[in-house]
Amino acid sequence: MIPKRIAGVHTDTSGVPGMFEGAARISYVDPTGKVWVLWGTEPVDSQGQEVFLPEGGWDDGEAAVDFTEQETVGRFGAGVRGWKVPAFDGELSLWIKGDKRPTVQAWQRWQRAWTAFQPFGQLRVMSEAGVNRYANVQLRGFSKPEFFPRGDVLMEHSVSYRCLDGCWFGEVERFTGNVSLSAGGDLPPLLKLRWDGSATSVRFPAGNTVSLSSIGAERIINLDRGYMGQITDADGNVDSQSWSVLRGVIGGVEIAPGEVANFKLGAGLTLEVTPRFLSPWR
């Protein structure tokens, strides 16, 4: 995709058929919350837009499942002993052009929008149906420019990143009361219980019921496998005291894609379900 006009304050970056199939908009959200629109299928009023993603500018940026196989007892095939989803890498090849400022200043501003330390920025892909996918991305490196341009001329630039989560996330769904959950996505979803801190109880898909005593403050219980019911406050700080009481009582809950699981949530509990995907295009 070649910009139709380089000079002036507006560059048309409307998409063409076949480019980023199924996507409507691609953007980057930096840790401060600023949204950098990089590409769109419809003409975008790019007043103020300084970073553009051309056709062919998206490299890698998709997850993969690493299966551990073992021989079967019979003569045919193999069985799966386990699996994991490792972190993945990606790279964006971009064009930068200053809007009401020299391009080199826009380039510097764009670089400051990325970080190698938490909180990371997010790459977001919105589909034509308005469905969002996002990945938390850690800066791994920038390309070095061959020269520093003067004025508002176009500048080529690339940024490499790593997604430590190993997946793309979808939009959070929230449930209360009796829940029959059918897991979507490509991978088991991220499950969390948002608890208002009042005395209540929850029955898990395995059939076990856990009672929660009042603690007088909102908490989040992470049901992801490996976290074993870790309890944090709204800012993500671990509540060691509350967690120690429930450690060994609440385990991880893993629901395979397409599997149906039933929860019974008492008053003050909300189940938050975040689907996981291997690719933003799915």
How should these model regions be labeled?
Residues 1-67:
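Polar/acidic, low-complexity leader/linker segments enriched in S/T/G and N/D
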Residues 2-5, 167-282:
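Intrinsically disordered, low-complexity segments enriched in serine, threonine, and glycine
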Residues 122-167:
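Short beta-strand and beta-hairpin "edge-sheet" elements
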Residues 19-24, 115-121, 195-199:
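A short, compositionally biased
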Residues 35-42, 46, 133-141, 209-216, ...:
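Short amphipathic beta-strand/extended segments with alternating polar/hydrophobic composition
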Residues 70-104, 151-167, 260-261:
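Oligomerization/assembly interface segments of phage tail-like spikes and tubes
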Residues 93-140:
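Short, acidic/charged, Gly/Pro-enriched secondary-structure junctions
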Residues 84-88, 115-117, 151-153, 185-187, ...:
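Solvent-exposed loop and beta-edge segments used for protein-protein assembly and interaction
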